[in-house]
Regions:
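A conserved short coil-to-beta-strand element within the FAD-binding core of flavoproteins
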Residues: 479-491, 593-604
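Small-residue-rich anion-binding loops in enzyme active sites
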Residues: 351-367, 481-502
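Flavin-dependent oxidoreductase catalytic cores
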Residues: 1-414, 418, 423-434, 442, ...
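Short phosphate-binding/catalytic loops that engage adenosine nucleotides
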Residues: 57, 108, 189, 432, ...
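Rossmann-like dinucleotide/flavin-binding elements
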Residues: 326, 405-436, 478-489, 500-509, ...
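Short beta-alpha connecting loops at secondary-structure transitions
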Residues: 288-293, 448-455, 563-567, 646-653
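Rossmann-like dinucleotide-binding cores of NAD(P)H-dependent redox enzymes
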Residues: 433-472, 524-525, 549-596
Length: 671
């Protein structure tokens, strides 16, 4: 009998009195829309974690924010990101017990994250410059107070001065950690995960010289700076005893001026007296969720390798970009990690773990690293979505959303973009026979440009996955074939699905000649056709990416945007700041906001600035990136070619990949 394809990743691991069924672990994550106002895990939340437990060895649940002395994160500031479970209410405890039990059903370790309130609530509630001026706990008495005027959702201050905490308060906080851990053990949780990274809460702040400027026994030397975090861990271990696993989420190193990798290892060698696992993370919260501009697939594996060598006897877990099982398996085989944590792998694939168990890694859908799973924007409802998995968070109802089918229908799909290909896969899974008609020489549609920009490698992986699936599944594809209603009608299909996409919009600007303008696809494919000075009209996410790409190709790119900031449509949380870093790193990139383009002239583009003045910027070439117009008329021309007719993707409404994937899935489930 052959061994598992990923034998190292699937090998059991003994930790204390527990045995992990494999090395696949789910880090703390949750589709935020699943949890309502309940102070206990909703049924939808339980269904979500149950699904992960079917294959993962450790399932970490989001997360307890309570403080046992009556303080916790105010409801109006938790953004829906963290569930507001009441650990001290007996009715809520009943549901928490059910959550642990549902994870145990699949022989998985039930783990709960702990985020003790005041150290996080304190900087949220105190205006900048006022931290530490009074009793920190007193600042949180008005739990429903609005945030201060200086408060910026995307720049939550993580730098309050811990100087003014007293030793008595340190003891209260440490006791609160221990008390919560004790209750979770009583509720049958096997493990707790204590957040101690990014200088985001008091234990992490106390260890970092960047935030700890104390001169007493809690500051200064390495021994003093580790005193409080070790106090927390010692209290927790004393409370729960030996028969509960304790993990810390830990930034392996720090920003410039902070602690070193060597100091980090020294702390972990002390902490291993109390903890079983360390989950190694980045030194900054946004970079802990790497995107396409991070060209290294798993940028933090090096920390695992270092700690494996320098902290013997502690189980080393790594996280950050671990998606492909071959990469995970190799990391363990080479002794760089003991266990692998992931969140986005399970978000982008409801059946991720099962695919790994079956060795079907080529059926794993790549993650786009767009981080829309954290929310769409700062001013939107904090709704998690996944760009490639339309079933995210639907575990409890996806079966009843599907229309019963016996299959057997012949379906013509007009268009060969990502939405068309994904719809064809879903249709085949339901027993139908899809046929794709693509007028161009290759599949890919609007995402073909991912082949050219190196930072679009996650999107390129997704495109190549879809094309590979067409070939692997034997789905009929007619390239270089411009379908007509007459052609489709003659084939006598049962269903016709129009996926005709959208075309770039040309704004009614004086001098805007479509024959002389460039658009995204051609710009990415042939940057050599553009002159030295390029003006990009439209500074949304696509326009900014065009500007970055051209800058890296040696052009001088000026991006004009009407709104008050560039890439305002991009993911605000754990994405925007890294995109901003990317364009700020390009000396040939210039972003101009509050700019209304007035005219395109020979060698220049004129615009009205935010003060109403006319300005001019040199332009040898002009790229129009002002949105897309759906090909509705073309799509509608296929109505009447079969008994059933549907429109999916951009031809209905120019939208995101996520919206297109949901459109493809929903339509296929109705046929």
């Amino acid at each position: 009998m052959s061994e598992p394809k990923f034998k190292h990743l699937l090998e059991p691991l003994k930790i204390g009195n527990y045995v992990l069924k494999n090395r696949m672990c789910v880090s703390n994550s949750l589709p935020h829309f699943l949890q309502g106002p309940e102070t206990y895990p909703a049924d939808t939340v339980m269904a979500h974690y149950e699904n992960k437990a079917k294959s993962a060895a450790i399932v970490t649940c989001m997360g307890i924010n309570n403080f046992s002395h009556g303080k916790q994160l105010p409801m109006n500031l938790d953004f829906g990101h963290f569930p507001d479970y009441d650990l001290y209410d007996t009715n809520s405890q009943n549901y928490l017990l059910q959550l642990a039990d549902s994870i145990h059903f699949y022989d998985s370790i039930a783990c709960m994250g702990i985020f003790v309130g005041p150290p996080s609530a304190y900087p949220l509630m105190v205006p900048k410059g006022q931290q530490g001026k009074a009793d920190p706990f007193a600042q949180t008495k008005s739990l429903n107070a609005p945030p201060p005027a200086e408060f910026d959702l995307m720049k939550i201050p993580a730098h309050e001065d811990p100087t003014y905490y007293t030793e008595e308060q340190f003891n209260l906080i440490a006791d609160s950690y221990a008390e919560q851990a004790g209750i979770l053990k009583m509720l049958d949780f096997d493990m707790i995960s204590i957040h101690m990274c990014y200088r985001a809460n008091l234990p992490a702040k106390m260890f970092s010289p960047i935030t700890n400027h104390r001169t007493d026994k809690f500051g200064g030397s390495l021994e003093n700076r580790m005193r409080f975090p070790l106090m927390v861990l010692e209290r927790v271990r004393q409370k729960v005893g030996k028969n509960m696993l304790i993990e810390i989420q830990w930034s392996a190193d720090d920003l410039e001026g902070g602690y070193t990798l060597e100091e980090s290892a020294a702390f972990l060698n002390e902490a291993k007296k109390y903890i079983d696992i360390v989950q190694l993370r980045a030194n900054e919260v946004d970079h802990a969720h790497p995107i396409g501009f991070e060209l290294e697939e798993t940028p933090f594996l090096k920390f695992g390798e270092y700690m494996k060598k320098n902290v013997p006897g502690l189980v080393i877990g790594v996280i950050g970009g671990f998606h492909y099982p071959a990469t995970c398996d190799k990391a363990i085989a080479e002794g760089k990690a003991d266990i692998i944590y992931a969140a986005r792998a399970y978000i982008s694939n409801n059946d991720y773990g099962q695919l790994v168990l079956e060795g079907r890694d080529d059926d794993i859908v790549p993650c786009l690293r767009c981080n829309k799973c954290h929310g769409r924007g700062a001013n939107d409802p904090f709704v998690s979505v996944c760009s490639v998995n339309p079933c995210i968070g639907l575990e409890q109802k996806v079966a009843r959303m599907q229309v019963p089918t016996k299959g057997g229908k012949r379906v013509a799909i007009i268009g060969g973009g990502p939405v068309a290909m994904r719809c064809a896969m879903y249709l085949q899974d339901r027993g139908h026979t899809p046929v794709i008609y693509e007028k161009g020489p290759q599949l890919g549609g609007a995402i073909i440009h991912a082949d050219y920009a190196e930072f679009k490698w996650p999107l390129r992986d997704f495109k190549n996955f879809l094309i590979h699936q067409m070939d692997k599944r034997g789905i009929a594809v007619h390239l270089n074939t411009e379908a007509t209603p007459e052609m489709i009608k003659a084939e006598n299909y049962d269903v016709v699905i129009a996926a005709t996409g959208a075309n770039p919009m040309v704004l009614p600007i004086p001098g805007a000649d479509p024959e002389k303008l460039f658009f995204a696809q051609e710009t990415f494919a042939h940057p050599e056709k553009l002159g030295e000075n390029v003006v990009v009209i439209g500074g949304g996410e696509v326009g900014v990416e065009i500007g970055i790409y051209l800058s890296r190709k040696g052009h001088k790119a000026s991006v004009l945007e009407m709104r008050d900031r560039l890439a305002a449509d991009s993911t605000a949380i754990h994405y925007y700041s890294m995109l901003e870093e990317a364009w700020e790193a390009e000396p040939n990139f210039t972003g101009i906001t509050g700019a209304r383009v007035a005219a395109i002239k020979d060698g220049a583009v004129e615009y009205i600035d935010k003060d109403g003045n006319t300005q001019s910027v040199p332009a040898d070439s002009v790229v129009m990136s002002a949105g897309m117009r759906p090909n509705k008329d073309l799509a509608l021309s296929f109505y009447g070619c079969a008994k059933e007719f549907y429109m999916i993707g951009d031809c209905k409404k120019a939208a995101t990949i996520q919206q297109g994937m949901r459109s493809a899935y929903a339509t296929a489930m109705r046929i």
